[in-house]
Amino acid sequence: MAQDQGEKENPMRELRIRKLCLNICVGESGDRLTRAAKVLEQLTGQTPVFSKARYTVRSFGIRRNEKIAVHCTVRGAKAEEILEKGLKVREYELRKNNFSDTGNFGFGIQEHIDLGIKYDPSIGIYGLDFYVVLGRPGFSIADKKRRTGCIGAKHRISKEEAMRWFQQKHDGIILPGN
C-alpha cells in the first residue's frame, strides 16, 4: 500500500559529496609555491598541505622530495559551495571522461580569479584542479582502522550513477568523451 502512494527513495542510497580535493601543481618549490598556497588558503579558509615530487626528472628540473604542489581537502557545506563556484566557471559542462569508474569526477580551471577571488598582482594567476569524491551513508566502514568492512557491490557507485547525480543535482551537461 505504501509503495502505491509514492515510492520513497531509500535514504541510505542517496549520493553525497564525501570530499572535494583542490590541487595546484606549480612544478617548482619557492616563491611561486608559497603564493599558490595563499590562493588555496583564501579560497578554502584552511591551511593547505605541500606535496613532494616522487622522482627526480632532470628535463623538468625537479628533484626527488622537492615540494612542487599544494593541495587541500574540503568537506561538508564548504565543499558544496566551492564546487558550485568551480562548476559555474565550467558552465556546468563536464565530459564523460571526467568521471571515473568508481563514481568520482574531476575537472580543472585555468584561472583562480574566476572563482570570485580578487586579483592580487603580488600573487599572480594560478589554475587549479578539482576532484570530487562521492559517497553514500555507510561508506565510512571501509575507512575504519579496526574491524574494517567492505562496501557491497550493490552499494558502490558506478560511473553512470555519478553522471546522473551530476545532471540532477547541478543541472549539468555531459559532453561526449575526447
Curated annotation (Swiss-Prot):
The keyword Nucleotidyltransferase does not apply. GO terms for biological process: negative regulation of proteasomal ubiquitin-dependent protein catabolic process; positive regulation of signal transduction by p53 class mediator; protein localization to nucleus; translation. Its main location: nucleus. It is found in: Nucleus, Nucleolus; Cytoplasm. GO terms for molecular function: RNA binding; rRNA binding; structural constituent of ribosome. It holds the Pfam family Ribosomal_L5_C. The modification N-acetylalanine is found at A2. The modification Phosphothreonine is found at T44, T47. Coiled coil: none annotated. There is a cross-link at K38, K52, K154 (Glycyl lysine isopeptide (Lys-Gly) (interchain with G-Cter in SUMO2)). The modification N6-acetyllysine is found at K52, K85. Keywords: Acetylation, Cytoplasm, Isopeptide bond, Nucleus, Phosphoprotein, Ribonucleoprotein, Ribosomal protein, RNA-binding, rRNA-binding, Ubl conjugation. InterPro entries: Ribosomal_uL5, Ribosomal_uL5_C, Ribosomal_uL5_CS, Ribosomal_uL5_dom_sf, Ribosomal_uL5_N. GO terms for cellular component: cytoplasm; cytoplasmic side of rough endoplasmic reticulum membrane; cytosolic large ribosomal subunit; large ribosomal subunit; nucleolus; nucleoplasm. The keyword rRNA-binding applies. Component of the ribosome, a large ribonucleoprotein complex responsible for the synthesis of proteins in the cell. The small ribosomal subunit (SSU) binds messenger RNAs (mRNAs) and translates the encoded message by selecting cognate aminoacyl-transfer RNA (tRNA) molecules. The large subunit (LSU) contains the ribosomal catalytic site termed the peptidyl transferase center (PTC), which catalyzes the formation of peptide bonds, thereby polymerizing the amino acids delivered by tRNAs into a polypeptide chain. Component of the large ribosomal subunit (LSU). Part of the 5S RNP complex, which is a LSU subcomplex composed of the 5S RNA, RPL5 and RPL11. Component of a hexameric 5S RNP precursor complex, composed of 5S RNA, RRS1, RPF2/BXDC1, RPL5, RPL11 and HEATR3; this complex acts as a precursor for ribosome assembly. Interacts with PML. Interacts with MDM2 (via its RanBP2-type zinc finger domain); negatively regulates MDM2-mediated TP53 ubiquitination and degradation. Interacts with NOP53; retains RPL11 into the nucleolus. NCBIfam families: PRK04219.1. Belongs to the universal ribosomal protein uL5 family. This is Large ribosomal subunit protein uL5. It comes from Sus scrofa (Pig).
